[in-house]
Amino acid sequence: GGMDATGGPLTKQAAELGIKAKVVGGDGMCTEKLAELAGEAVVNVTCSEAGMALSKMAQGADFQKRYKERFNSDVQIYAPFTYDAVYVLVDSMKRANSTDPAKILAVMPDTKMQGLVGNIAFDNKGDMKEGVITLYDFKDKKKTVLEVIKM
């Protein structure tokens, strides 16, 4: 699958050849454009994105509204994570009482805060302690949350 530009035609061609198989892809393929490229065969696709679906975030609808008003565009895939990353950085700068990168990095692993994407805390490798993957399928050519998997 790879990206929507390759996964869409692959999915469509497989269906046209009579291949009855699920097509599984990652975030590069997991787009609304995939439905256009794959046509009716998009029902054979299951794809994933790192993190909670915006529709499942407690503050997701409000963020979507404010984002649209500010940028005149729909929320891009990783915008909620970038939004939270800025707050993690600012929080770390405050706790370090510094803008020195070494001092900021020293306190960042101790971050514990509620963000748009959920609870933010890191393990000893720097990964989110409460990571999430969202699986999607397509119904009526619309990307739809299939399942949220908590890590």
Q: What is each stretch, according to the model?
A:
Residues 1-151:
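Extracytosolic ligand-binding ectodomains
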